């Protein structure tokens, strides 16, 4: 619950992005109370492309090195979930000491299509149920990529993004 407690309305938490034990130690030494492992820098650091260019197991290996090096809560960008179940994602993250995750609605393994709102909420719900079943409050951050894409009409993009994130919150996301 430490990571969740850092998320306070009106007082946003700043999570610096780290990619290895060295960058994590630098961030903690600078005074940050929690960290996030970014998909792009961690993939770049091992010569792989962002967008699930490295496997989930490879990501977990890097996260394990980071959590072994620092004693602060770690959240991990799991991109679109590597086509895994909520249980597999949560079990993997908890197994290496992470207590938060970021899940996006672009499905990299399926031609970078955008999940429907219902699909994204279903995945968020599966992640929440898996976390709750573990007994650890994993902080679930749901993200939409609507503003990074040219999907749909520009005139209602903000409304569609709000609707997508509202549905994700209803499914159990802690952070949007």
Positions of PLM-derived features:
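Alpha/beta enzyme core
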Residues: 1-176
